[in-house]
Amino acid sequence: MGAFLDKPKMEKHNAQGQGNGLRYGLSSMQGWRVEMEDAHTAVIGLPSGLETWSFFAVYDGHAGSQVAKYCCEHLLDHITNNQDFRGSAGAPSVENVKNGIRTGFLEIDEHMRVMSEKKHGADRSGSTAVGVLISPQHTYFINCGDSRGLLCRNRKVHFFTQDHKPSNPLEKERIQNAGGSVMIQRVNGSLAVSRALGDFDYKCVHGKGPTEQLVSPEPEVHDIERSEEDDQFIILACDGIWDVMGNEELCDFVRSRLEVTDDLEKVCNEVVDTCLYKGSRDNMSVILICFPSAPKVSAEAVKKEAELDKYLESRVEEIIKKQVEGVPDLVHVMRTLASENIPSLPPGGELASKRNVIEAVYNRLNPYKNDDTDSASTDDMW
């Protein structure tokens, strides 16, 4: 679960789509981890009378990818097909939806446990889940674990989910009541999240219900009334993103990228690359969902971006030419630039978000470059 590669796998999986007045893009990267354990769901237009609803989620697996993969394929069905969600005839009420989401999580968790026991020994993998269910009137934020979702409204972070960590007082109380302990901020000194799907080794305390176990599958659900004028975008991401970027930082960075491109896949790729260069060592997945009032491409912002790239290119060339013998390594170039007051760097991303631009110029000007040299070795992180 904690093993790392000698160099990161930087290939990305992308997707994008639109409908119901929404646009979305997503990006995921294995990064430094030995295995890719993340998964995701993106569905615009749900079946059975919910054509104007949409669902998006990120799943961050651990100790294997089985639970994350199963949830990405089946969690939505467990949510929308249970009686608590449907309630009476017609569109489900807010309380129906919230109860149905909770029931769906508990049902799929129990279903996976039964399936696992029927096989050769229980599956030991688990997964966080963070998602949004978007109706024409409401956005329902869903969280179980330490992945995170946030809503940017009127250029500010309006809402974000709370991470479920063992050190949280309420989580710690439940863990201790189930006979467990919190050591080095982990459940029984091992698991770093206090709520998750799967992780059945932590859900076998006799006399305790499913939401009273060492690790609970119960999600927190928050309903937020939509604001057509002010809602701009939603970000869903695993902790590989949040480990190196704060809520406001990521919100500011995404907003700045939306002012220079309307390609949401590209924006998500920039988020993932920037987090890698900021030092993230985990799998990374991010979904960006834009409302009609999301920032639009600005000619002024595009011009400033081009000027910044040109400035960085000239500075890299100057640094290389200044070297008396040979060519300085890329780490030296990055550290030199990091020590300077460079205007107009993307907020939140800063110099790390321009690593690809800098590296491209460096490689073009470096006659000694080895094409097999990894572009993000551990020594490069400054």
Swiss-Prot record:
GO terms for molecular function: calmodulin-dependent protein phosphatase activity; magnesium ion binding; manganese ion binding; phosphoprotein phosphatase activity; R-SMAD binding. The gene is Ppm1a. Binds 2 magnesium or manganese ions per subunit. Mn(2+) 2 binds at D60, D239, D282. Gene3D superfamilies: Phosphatase 2C, C-terminal domain suprefamily, PPM-type phosphatase domain. Its main location: nucleus. Its cofactor is Mg(2+); Mn(2+). Monomer. Interacts with SMAD2; the interaction dephosphorylates SMAD2 in its C-terminal SXS motif resulting in disruption of the SMAD2/SMAD4 complex, SMAD2 nuclear export and termination of the TGF-beta-mediated signaling. Interacts with SMAD2; the interaction dephosphorylates SMAD2 in its C-terminal SXS motif resulting in disruption of the SMAD2/SMAD4 complex, SMAD2 nuclear export and termination of the TGF-beta-mediated signaling. Interacts with the phosphorylated form of IKBKB/IKKB. PANTHER family: PROTEIN PHOSPHATASE. It is a lipid-anchor. It is found in: Nucleus; Cytoplasm, Cytosol; Membrane. A lipid is attached at G2 (N-myristoyl glycine). It catalyses: O-phospho-L-seryl-[protein] + H2O = L-seryl-[protein] + phosphate; O-phospho-L-threonyl-[protein] + H2O = L-threonyl-[protein] + phosphate. N-myristoylation is essential for the recognition of its substrates for dephosphorylation. GO terms for cellular component: cytosol; membrane; nucleus; plasma membrane. Keywords: Cytoplasm, Hydrolase, Lipoprotein, Magnesium, Manganese, Membrane, Metal-binding, Myristate, Nucleus, Phosphoprotein, Protein phosphatase. This is Protein phosphatase 1A. It comes from the Eukaryota. The modification Phosphoserine is found at S375, S377. The keyword Ligase does not apply. Mn(2+) 1 binds at D60, G61. Enzyme with a broad specificity. Negatively regulates TGF-beta signaling through dephosphorylating SMAD2 and SMAD3, resulting in their dissociation from SMAD4, nuclear export of the SMADs and termination of the TGF-beta-mediated signaling. Dephosphorylates PRKAA1 and PRKAA2. Plays an important role in the termination of TNF-alpha-mediated NF-kappa-B activation through dephosphorylating and inactivating IKBKB/IKKB.
